[in-house]
Design a protein with these regions (language model features):
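Secretory targeting signals
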Residues: 1-2
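Non-catalytic accessory regions flanking glycosidase/transglycosidase catalytic cores in CAZymes
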Residues: 8-20, 25-181, 199-228, 288-293, ...
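Active-site-proximal loop/turn and secondary-structure-junction residues that shape catalytic pockets
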Residues: 87, 128-130, 186-190, 225-229, ...
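Short, flexible/disordered intra-domain loops and linkers
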Residues: 97-98, 194, 261-269, 336-341, ...
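Flexible glycine/acidic-rich beta-alpha junction loops that bind and position SAM and/or redox cofactors
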Residues: 131-134, 259-260, 329-339
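A short small-residue
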Residues: 136-147, 187-189, 251, 255-263
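Noncatalytic carbohydrate-binding groove/subsite architecture in carbohydrate-active enzymes
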Residues: 198-323
Length: 505
């Protein structure tokens, strides 16, 4: 099993490798789901729509990326977007040399203006290090070569952060910026992203947190934004000792992360349960400190499997305030410049393929968005809700998706092991014979791949072909079905498939 460190070290090679999908499944296995329309068990917090990830800040200036963001907002209810590198030298924030004594926030404004104009707020990742403040010249091995060294002076870093925050308040107003989140750095426990030590990061966090609160006590700051849920006890202990604010705790988990590192035991959980188990562990670590009850943000995770997305979100509901899937768009150039719009096997990180083409992961979020705000009791693979019109429930057929890295975007092959299932959904409290609407997403329905293959799998589809592919990948109109006399609906779901059942009262 690869882990995040190995992924980063072998990223370019993994991207260059050929990819394919192989699916193995048997026919006809049954799954039982029961939903009680009469039993409201509390609020259903839409933790999945609070944030999603993206590439670097400068990529957000592109029309194609902004079109993807706008679509995400309009069709999935996305509230915030997180991206790297708001301080990167490619935005000219503070390169040093002949560029003046003060920071330049012109391009920062263009980035945030573009996000806010589309009805989305930024989740502000404070990264990476402006050249003027850097203690060295170590660069991130991405296409944009950001400086990943600690600040030469934590005090100067703090003054810079204070000036940055004051500028944001001057431009957007305190009431707006108080709704944002300020996350200090990205994965500082990986040498790929930070050349300093844990102590260097803690000093950097202290300076940033004190600077932000020095401008406005109502602004929200948190961290440590580590990979694989590392440094939690140490970070929270340091902050408690130094009496520092931690308004939220953030970390990243991928299903393929090293379980020995995560849990102290290799292969303790199947892929599907790694993320929920890690979130339960982090929640327990937080609540053992003075920061008990602090919001837990899973500010990076990912899956390209519809059923896996539904399963992970459903099982993280008790622990997380927000889950930010990486990432919204295949306008994405961290390791290299993609030479494809679609491809077999691993299709990249983006839930929207290039040219605004929806993928099954995006369409899964569209279905999640149609769930209501009250949760209904359910057993089996289901997330059920009460809506203004009646009820909506997402059901799924979970399969094991095996990729070397455990995440989309870095895998040379994609192997799916699962069974096609007849999912029998009993709706307790529904009128026998009632009409329901059913919408499906899997690797064939709500997917661009069937039409792309039909067109000959072109590497560079023509404009007319792109339009055909995009139309083919849209969610189909709901299928109208009737419950049987026992209030049961039987669905035929392939491995990875999800279905949204909607019932009018």
């Amino acid at each position: 099993m690869w882990n995040r460190r190995e992924i980063m070290g072998a990223g370019a090679a993994a991207f260059a490798a050929s990819s394919f999908t192989r699916t193995a499944f048997a026919q006809g296995e049954q799954e039982q789901v029961e939903i009680d329309l009469r039993q409201d068990i509390g609020a259903l917090d839409h933790i999945w729509s609070r944030c999603a990830g993206s590439d670097r800040a400068s990529a957000t200036l592109r029309e194609a990326w902004r079109n993807d963001l706008e679509r995400f907002r309009n069709e999935t209810g996305l509230e915030r977007v997180r991206f790297h590198g708001i301080f990167n030298d490619d935005l000219g924030v503070w390169p040093g040399g002949m560029n003046g004594k003060d920071p330049n926030f012109q391009n920062v404004d263009a980035v945030y203006d573009g996000v806010l104009e589309r009805g989305v707020q930024p989740f502000v990742e404070l990264s990476f290090m402006p050249k003027k403040l850097a203690s060295g010249n170590t660069k991130l091995s991405f296409t944009y070569n950001a400086n990943i060294t600690p600040p030469a002076s934590p005090e100067a870093w703090g003054q810079f952060i204070a000036g940055f925050v004051r500028h944001l308040i001057d431009r957007y107003g305190a009431n707006e910026v108080r709704q944002w989140y300020f996350e200090v750095w990205n994965e500082p426990n990986l040498t790929w992203f930070f050349s300093g030590t844990q102590a260097d990061y803690f000093a950097m966090y202290k300076a940033a947190a004190q600077a932000i609160k020095g401008v406005d006590q109502k602004l929200r700051v948190g961290g440590p934004s580590t990979a694989a849920a590392q440094w939690m006890p140490e970070f929270l202990g340091f902050c408690a000792q130094e009496n520092l604010p931690v308004d939220f705790v953030s970390t990243h988990i991928y299903a393929g992360d090293d379980q020995m590192e995560l849990f102290g035991q290799a292969n303790r959980y199947p892929h599907k349960d790694v993320i929920p188990a890690a979130m339960a562990q982090v929640r327990k670590q937080i609540d053992a400190t003075r920061y008990r009850g602090a919001e837990l943000w899973l500010s990076e995770w990912s899956s390209d499997s519809p059923a896996m997305i539904a399963h992970v979100i459903s099982n993280c509901l008790p622990y997380c305030h927000a889950m930010s899937q990486w990432c919204i768009s295949n306008v994405f150039e961290e390791i290299n410049f993609p030479n494809f719009i679609l491809k077999e096997g691993d299709g990249g990180w983006g839930m929207l393929a290039q040219r605004n083409i929806p993928r099954p992961s995006f369409n899964t979020y569209k279905l999640l968005h149609r769930l209501g705000q009250r949760r209904l009791a359910a057993t089996g693979p289901a997330l059920a809700s009460r809506t203004k019109e009646g009820a909506a429930a997402l059901v799924w057929n979970l399969a094991e998706v095996k990729q070397p890295s455990g995440v989309p975007g870095m895998a040379s092959q994609r192997i799916v092991n699962g069974q096609r299932k007849n999912v029998q959904v009993r709706l307790k409290g529904a009128r026998p014979g009632a009409t329901v609407r059913v919408s499906y997403v899997d690797q064939e329905r709500g997917s661009p791949l069937p039409k792309w293959r039909e067109l000959g799998s072109p590497q560079y589809p023509r404009k007319g072909e792109i339009d055909q592919i995009r139309r083919s990948a849209e969610l189909a109109s709901p299928e109208t079905r009737r419950l049987d006399r026992q209030g049961v609906l039987t669905l035929d779901l392939p491995p990875e498939g999800v279905a949204l059942i909607e019932l009018k009262a």
